[in-house]
């Protein structure tokens, strides 16, 4: 997997690790319209699958038409997201990327991390295939950003992933029980050997 995507996957996996399948279903403040930790992950996974489908179509059909030009709005969004790494606020997710109750089984944090890695890796293999076949040409059309090259697609998924990493962290802080801190150090050698702290005077 490309290093820039690997970093996002590792951060996501670390954030959900240790959460049980009950906690990953909880909504902040009990409000159903606020996504649970699993729903945040599902949204990302659906995005990876949608991108993978577009890449597979392009690999099967051949090059994207060079007549396909980006609009001024698409150029502006590319500048904002791909160059400055900022997602515009208030933009609703596509219907295809909205988590639907029951479409995924309830799973724990480790399984969610594995799911993110599996889907990201599958998408990245298609990025590699497109780069080999099309080079630096645009390979697929993003619904908002227009036609993108492989490097731009990777950049988008990094920015999008980091945006939802912040959301995921906030969700877990609100719904997860307090984690018990690990002991700073184990028992000392004296404690292990049961040596008395003071010896009686002779």
Give the role of each language-model region:
Residues 1-202:
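Aromatic-glycine hotspot motif
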């Amino acid at each position: 997997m490309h290093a820039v995507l690997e970093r996002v996957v590792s951060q996501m996996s670390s954030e959900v690790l240790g959460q049980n399948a009950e906690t990953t279903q909880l909504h902040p403040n009990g409000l159903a319209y606020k996504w649970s930790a699993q729903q945040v992950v599902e949204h990302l996974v659906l995005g990876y699958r949608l991108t993978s489908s577009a890449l597979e179509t392009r690999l099967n059909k051949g090059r994207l038409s060079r007549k396909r030009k980006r609009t001024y709005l698409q150029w502006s969004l590319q500048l904002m997201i791909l160059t400055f790494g900022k997602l515009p606020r208030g933009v609703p997710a596509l219907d295809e990327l909205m988590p639907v109750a029951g479409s995924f089984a309830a799973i724990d944090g480790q399984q969610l991390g594995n799911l993110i890695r599996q889907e990201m890796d599958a998408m990245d293999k298609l990025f590699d295939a497109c780069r080999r076949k099309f080079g630096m040409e645009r390979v697929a059309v993003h619904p908002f950003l227009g036609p993108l090259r492989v490097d731009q697609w990777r950049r988008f998924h990094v920015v999008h992933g980091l945006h939802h990493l912040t959301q995921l962290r906030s969700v877990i802080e609100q719904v997860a029980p307090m984690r018990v801190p690990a002991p700073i150090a184990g028992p000392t050698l004296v404690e292990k050997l049961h040596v008395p702290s003071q010896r009686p005077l002779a």
